[in-house]
Amino acid sequence: MKKILAAENLSYSINEAKLFQGLSFELHEGNALHVLGSNGSGKTSLLRIISGLTKPTRGIIKKYNTKNICFVGHKNALKQYLTVEDNISLLEVDKHIDLNIFLEKLELNNLLDVMVANLSYGQQKKSALLRVFLNDSDLLVLDEPCVGLDKNSKNILCSFLRDQKEDKKALIFSSHLSLDIDSEFINLDKVTS
């Protein structure tokens, strides 16, 4: 399997507080990494470092065979003043994907003309997850992807992520919930000083 990413001796601090230090791991195509830890342990910071949105205090991230990374964080990155359909039109959609299948599965097909600001939190979360479903990325980085989702939507998400692994894509996600996805684990509570 091809190596997608390697973290070498990563450390991250905010002011004087060390969130984690000396963290090293590799991720290969078709593998998943579940990041665990208590609130404030640095899960979101680690995912942002992996995505290139935040710099580590120390250490490096090496990316191999990675042309595109898709990050979905707590803030859903949707344009609140646009409709769901307008937000979708801003994406580079993989041409082999039938958008209508995902809209129907996520129960968004009747909400295309609704402004994002008028959606519930769960509906906004599902709209943001469309980025993952429609994007042709080598590495999917998801920060608490199940927060705000109902059971059916969680099952759809897990099924999709399992399919992505089979398609040789790499996954990194944080979740307080156990997800039905075969993955390795990093517990940030065990890599702090």
Residue ranges and their predicted role:
Residues 5-7, 19-22:
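Conserved structural motif at the start of ABC-family nucleotide-binding domains
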Residues 51:
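Helix-to-loop junction immediately C-terminal to a conserved catalytic motif
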Residues 75, 80-98:
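Q-loop/switch helix immediately C-terminal to the Walker
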Residues 97-112, 133:
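Conserved ABC ATPase "signature" region
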Residues 115-122:
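Conserved ABC ATPase signature
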Residues 129, 168:
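Hydrophobic anchor residue at the start of the ABC signature
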Residues 134-138:
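A short, proline-enriched helix->beta-strand linker immediately N-terminal to the Walker B motif
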Residues 140-144:
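Catalytic Walker B motif of ABC-type/P-loop ATPase nucleotide-binding domains
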